[in-house]
């Protein structure tokens, strides 16, 4: 069997047999809002008790508070739910949408292309079988979260988001968990407690968006904005040469398990429509697309043959399926194309290159630009956010921050104001390849010219010498621009520039970018961002190995790396790891010095002797070393200790 067929078979088996897969030592908890149907999921990580004294026979333990973390995995990690990918996820937001009474159910789909696909019996085996009815705004109504926010309405989605962003941090009482360094926020407004009113205000002023198509009620509300947690997008999608519907659904579930806040389906191969339907019906996170890719497929890949009619039908098709945000490359103008002539890598954006080719072939501005107001009208009927694409982003560090890139950025700022006239939510896409010392300028230019609309960047990659490791070079840039104020980071996988990512590549890209986003939150001083770090550091110092694994971004890999060299069960309670071994573990020695100093200080006080030598850490180390050799060093807790701690 070929590797292609094998991959598809394995993915099909995954879909057919998928069951709930909770994280290790974690439970799904729900925080309730002001009404019973607002239940916000979080992952609660249970921790072992800390040994604080006593004897081997009668140890004294102190409990550690469980730690709650942001959870994007949906019901796929909820033991109370039965997974059935053929019937999709629960329609969480359906009741909220219906009670607003500003939408209506359609008797049939509006897109000509969708009608053709539904009538094609050869697609029956591929088609998602439980198709929902289509919903659209009633005549004269606008159904966007931006519209509601500007009317002063706090929607259930906004309350849900406020609870989600706070992550229950008010419950922590441990001083160790609550300590946090002040950050440098570069002007971001980071309140200690996020309220539903704060969410409404940020959305109303265009500084944040809530991607929430009325035809994707399965999605759990989330927010993108620089005054909130930095988010991460995962790209999936087939190509003309590889992948299948089963594999893309598998990637979706995998990406959300590892922290994907949104997912973009960038499919460019066969059966794009059917692939997207499967993804939407099973996605707990917002789904984005680049409609241009499918429009190009409809004209057999000939860019010059694209036109507004094809594009319009594609937008309606995808909006009625439930796509939450569209990447629209409307800012690439005809006069900007010559600016790229002397670039090292020219135009590297797929969407950008398509538009540039069309503009040159017709010698006029693209239909995305000339029909932008009509695009906004379509988006307003379904609450599809617009992600204004950077078709002229630099594809090499040599081209960073050039005339073409910033000319397009200014046009994106102008289009942002147009979209806001229609109460359509907007985010701005950014680079790309930018060396570290030039990253901050990108954030400053975007804030100035795009009126503080959320920024969403691909990296940026800080060097061009890392094929196979572009997730690392881009993760560096992502952490920096996230710190400066970027609201969402688009992940890069190890396969960037080399091939279509597989399931494992998706995980590596996600973990790398969750790390970058978290580092940015810490640097900004986002309230509560340090709780997880503090909990893990405390577990590390106390040799609570299982807690270290479970608090990490990737418990499976952390555990595997540890067990690779210390596989025995005794290794789980060892006071060292294979990096330093028993004689050179800094934390073990530090613990011993701390205990010795505490004991000696007490003796010194009782006997009224000088304790000057205690101020000399070397003297303390020498004395402790002698004691260590005289009494022998016990490297493991006895089994009884382990049983009690468990």
Swiss-Prot record:
Homodimer. Belongs to the ThiC family. GO terms for cellular component: cytosol. Pathway: Cofactor biosynthesis; thiamine diphosphate biosynthesis. Coiled coil: none annotated. This is Phosphomethylpyrimidine synthase. Pfam families: ThiC-associated (PF13667), ThiC_Rad_SAM (PF01964). Catalyzes the synthesis of the hydroxymethylpyrimidine phosphate (HMP-P) moiety of thiamine from aminoimidazole ribotide (AIR) in a radical S-adenosyl-L-methionine (SAM)-dependent reaction.
């Amino acid at each position: 069997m070929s590797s292609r067929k094998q991959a598809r078979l394995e993915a099909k088996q995954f879909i057919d047999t998928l069951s709930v897969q909770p994280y290790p030592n974690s439970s799904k908890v729900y925080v309730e809002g002001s009404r019973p149907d607002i239940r916000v999921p979080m992952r609660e990580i249970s921790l072992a008790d800390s040994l604080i004294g006593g004897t081997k026979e009668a140890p004294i333990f102190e409990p550690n508070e469980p730690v709650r973390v942001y959870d994007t995995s949906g019901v796929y990690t909820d033991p109370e739910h039965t997974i059935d990918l053929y019937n999709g996820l629960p329609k969480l937001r359906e009741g909220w949408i219906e009670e607003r009474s500003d939408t209506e159910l359609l008797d049939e789909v509006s897109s000509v292309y969708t009608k053709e696909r539904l009538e094609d019996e050869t697609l029956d085996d591929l088609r998602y079988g439980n198709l929902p009815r289509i919903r659209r705004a009633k005549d004269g109504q606008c159904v966007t979260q931006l519209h509601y926010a500007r009317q002063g309405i706090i929607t259930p989605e906004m309350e849900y988001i406020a609870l989600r962003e706070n992550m229950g941090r008010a419950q922590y009482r441990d001083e160790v968990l609550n300590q946090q360094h002040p950050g440098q926020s570069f002007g971001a407004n980071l309140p200690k407690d996020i309220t539903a009113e704060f969410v409404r205000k940020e959305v109303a002023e265009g500084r944040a968006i809530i991607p929430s198509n009325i035809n994707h009620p399965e999605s759990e509300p989330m927010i993108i904005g620089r005054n909130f947690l930095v988010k991460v997008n995962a790209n999936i999608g087939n190509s003309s040469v590889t992948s299948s519907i089963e594999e893309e659904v598998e990637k979706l579930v995998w990406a959300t398990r590892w922290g994907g806040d949104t997912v973009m389906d960038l499919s460019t191969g066969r059966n794009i429509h059917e692939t997207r339907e499967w993804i939407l019906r099973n996605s707990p996170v917002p789904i984005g697309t680049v409609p241009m890719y499918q429009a190009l497929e409809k004209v057999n890949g000939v860019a010059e043959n694209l036109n507004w009619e094809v594009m319009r039908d594609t937008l309606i098709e995808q909006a009625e399926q439930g796509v939450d945000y569209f990447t629209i490359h409307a800012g690439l103008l005809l006069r900007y194309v010559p600016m790229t002539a002397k670039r090292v890598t020219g135009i590297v954006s797929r969407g950008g290159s398509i538009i540039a080719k069309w503009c040159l072939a017709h010698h006029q501005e693209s239909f995305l630009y000339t029909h932008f107001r009509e695009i906004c009208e379509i988006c307003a009927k379904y609450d599809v956010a617009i992600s204004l694409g950077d078709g002229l982003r630099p594809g090499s560090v040599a081209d960073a921050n050039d005339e073409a890139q910033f000319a397009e950025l200014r046009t994106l700022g102008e289009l942002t104001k147009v979209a806001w006239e229609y109460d359509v939510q907007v985010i701005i896409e950014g680079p790309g390849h930018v060396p570290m010392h030039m990253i901050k300028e990108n954030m400053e230019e975007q804030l100035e010219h795009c009126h503080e609309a959320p920024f969403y960047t691909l990296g940026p990659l800080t060097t061009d010498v890392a094929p196979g490791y572009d997730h690392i070079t881009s993760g560096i840039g992502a952490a920096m621009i996230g710190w400066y104020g970027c609201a969402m980071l688009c992940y890069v996988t190890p396969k960037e520039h080399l091939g279509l990512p597989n399931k494992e590549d998706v995980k590596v890209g996600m973990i790398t970018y969750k790390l970058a986003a978290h580092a940015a939150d810490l640097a900004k001083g986002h309230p509560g961002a340090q709780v997880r770090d503090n909990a893990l550091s405390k577990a590390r110092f106390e040799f609570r190995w299982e807690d270290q694994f479970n608090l990490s971004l990737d418990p499976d890999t952390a555990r595997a790396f540890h067990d690779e060299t210390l596989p025995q069960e005794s290794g789980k309670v060892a006071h060292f790891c294979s990096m330093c071994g028993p004689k050179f573990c800094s934390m073990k020695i530090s613990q011993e010095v701390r205990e010795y100093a505490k004991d000696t200080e007490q003796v010194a006080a009782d006997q009224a002797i000088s304790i000057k030598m205690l101020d000399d850490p070397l003297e303390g180390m020498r004395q402790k070393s002698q004691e260590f050799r005289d009494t022998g060093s016990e490297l493991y807790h006895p089994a009884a200790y382990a049983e009690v701690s468990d």
